[in-house]
Regions:
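The canonical Cys-X-X-Cys-His
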Residues: 59, 63-73, 113, 128-132
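Bacterial N-terminal signal peptides that target proteins for export
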Residues: 1-10
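Gly/Gly-Pro-rich "capping" loops immediately C-terminal to redox-active cysteine motifs
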Residues: 56-58, 72-102
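Axial heme c-ligation environment in periplasmic c-type cytochrome domains
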Residues: 23-29, 78-85, 103-136
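Short, conserved sequence motifs enriched in acidic/basic residues, glycine, and aromatics
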Residues: 50, 91, 119-120
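Short sequence/structural segments immediately N-terminal
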Residues: 62, 137-139
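Electrostatic cytochrome c docking/interface patches
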Residues: 28-62
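N-terminal signal peptide c-region/cleavage motif recognized by signal peptidases
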Residues: 15-19
Length: 139
């Protein structure tokens, strides 16, 4: 009986562990951007929604649905991925952010961050940037 219980426990642990490793395979969730100015297909160089309260609201929701699993709730990283509250403000931070959401992050053939622009609109991603600037902290 004890062996049977130990085997059952080991199988449950294995099944749970597999789910943890698979979290990176989820499909990004769609983001509703009604109320934001349409931006078109060509990416802008700077965040057009900076300090826009509607964009911050949309960005907070989009962040929680698509980014928090790796970057932490309320953008407070638990160490898995960079703390996005520390991104540089303004145009310099926009440049880095844009490059990362368009190209993702791949090292040694491993995908650390998907190309989010393949899944979410420019409007949604700039809204996330607006949210991140609203919760930014200085080191």
């Amino acid at each position: 009986m004890a062996i049977k219980n130990n085997c059952a426990g080991a199988l449950l642990l294995l099944a749970f562990s597999a789910n943890l490793w698979a979290h990176g395979d989820v499909v990004p969730q769609a983001v509703k951007t009604e109320g934001l100015e349409a931006l078109g297909e060509e990416w802008l160089e700077e965040n057009p929604y900076r300090d826009n309260s509607r964009a911050i609201e949309i960005g907070a929701s989009a962040y929680n649905q698509n980014c928090a699993a790796c970057h932490g709730l309320e953008a407070k990283s638990g160490g898995i991925a960079p703390d996005l509250r520390l991104l540089e403000a303004g145009a310099l931070g926009d440049e880095w952010y844009k490059e990362r959401v368009i190209n993702g992050a791949v090292r040694d053939g491993r995908v650390y961050m998907p190309k989010m622009a393949d899944y979410l609109s420019q409007e949604a991603l700039w809204a996330v940037r607006s949210y991140l600037e609203s919760v930014a902290i200085e080191e």
